[in-house]
Amino acid sequence: MATNDLSRLPFRCLARLVPTMLLLAAPAAWLQAQPADWAEPFPGHRVIGNLYAVGTAGLGVFLITSDDGHILINTGLEDSTPLIRENIESVGYQLEDVRILLTMQAHWDHTAALAEIKEIAGAEMWATEGDARVLEDGGFSDPHFGGRVSFEPVEVDRIINDGEIIELGDVRLRVHEHPGHTEGSSSYSMQVAEGGRDYNVVVANMGTINEGKRLVVDPTYPGVAEDFARTYASQKAMDIDVWVAAHGGQYGLHDKYEPGQAYSPDTFVDPEGFLAEVERLEAIYEEQVAEERQ
């Protein structure tokens, strides 16, 4: 971890001391009642250029390839490593060549296999300041789902910030901090050249509000309402051609792509759909804020 991150050392130590039995006991009712498609295999496929979807039918896991190793964004549930490996190999690459691990949000459904893949690949875990602590204590400090360890803690090697450009080989990936869903939620964007055209591509963390989360009075996460508002404004201002998200249902995966479908760079072109989804989520947010203020 970078020298300016030593202030979080106690959380790393805490994570290492968490009893294994506590981790095994983590699947409480809210963990067990997960959608079936989160664990349902789905073929790996090319989204556009050097961006591949290698997750499940319901969970977005994305591989960005370069000439000097690869970036993996998200994992799935704790037993998802074999599936992710198989999907990566099916599109012509190797899990062991992953150099950087990223996540869009520090919730167990996107982080539970990070520690295992980090060890297998020898990759570095990069994360925003807002999510790093949650990653390192296995979800214990999460403002909404916390109070228990919900995934294997993963050590963060580097803090990334809004606007930063992640460079790996020929990849230039921009970090967009889009907090609200978690304090450190983030999206990632890059430009892809295909067929003489440049496409603006974003791996977007959408501003969804978990059931039971309060926005106006939420002492475990001060400023969450303002964070959501900034995220919606930021996303509406983005120039996007192609987008994917943390859940297949959020970006219409199964409407846009069928297994075995021939590759086209235009399959996931959907700027109107992105804006419509952001505006839909913003309307839900505004309605909840108004209700809480009554």
Predicted features by range, described:
Residues 34, 40-42, 46-48, 97, ...:
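Metallo-beta-lactamase
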Residues 37-91, 95, 187-209:
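Conserved beta-strand hairpin/beta-sheet module of binuclear metal-dependent hydrolase folds
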